[in-house]
UniProtKB/Swiss-Prot annotation:
Disulfide bonds: none annotated. It comes from the Bacteria. It holds the Pfam family Lactamase_B_2. This is UPF0173 metal-dependent hydrolase RoseRS_3945. Keywords: Hydrolase. Belongs to the UPF0173 family. One of its GO terms (molecular function) is hydrolase activity. PANTHER family: UPF0173 METAL-DEPENDENT HYDROLASE MJ1163, UPF0173 METAL-DEPENDENT HYDROLASE MJ1163-RELATED. SMART domains: Lactamase_B.
Amino acid sequence: MATIGRETTISWLGHGTFHILTPGGKKVLIDAWVDGNPSCPDEWKQRVRSEGLDVIFLTHGHFDHIADILALANETSATIVGQFDITSWIASKGVSQDRLVGFNKGGTVEVAGIRATMTHATHSSTFTDNGVIVPMGTEAGYVLRMENGFTIYHTGDTAVTMDMQIIGDLYHPELVILPIGDHFTMDPMQAAYALKLIRPTFAIPEHYGTFPILRGTPDQLREQCNAFGVNVTVIDLKPGESVS
């Protein structure tokens, strides 16, 4: 497996959930679906609690990205970051406002030494709360700059958009995390074109294989990258695996 070499460890917990150990020792979760996530190893369901979390970034409000946010809010001391609509809903459930950072696309915040810029995505964002479908703002991604300047772009659930070229031009992310599963997000061909626009060194595919309908594969992503002439190292993690 390739190595990143940027004092950062990225672990895939399955589906769209990632754990990042930053150069400064901060523990970061991107999206909060662990307990009901069929791809998440039992070890990680315990580790996110026993080791604690400093920050949780939420990309949007679908159950497979926020189902465990209230439990993790109660069981860790993490600061929770997301679009204002999502953090307002979390506050309505009793989570203290001083643990919530709500902002919006184009905005940048600094949390636990990490500079986070919220980016555009194109998807949808609702949550079923006690049988009622609740709007959760709009879908988003994040450009995350670690304490040492290492820059990660998590696209969130999305199709390919030309905004990705702007993100590449402005922020020059070295590593991109992006979905390849098809049906609910872009497929491997669109993901390869997204990487052509962004021009990172590394890519980690996600949001595939959890359910049969999410049929894109890392090998298909590599094939499409070759077809588009994209020079990128695709890091094919299995759920529970890490890369540093």
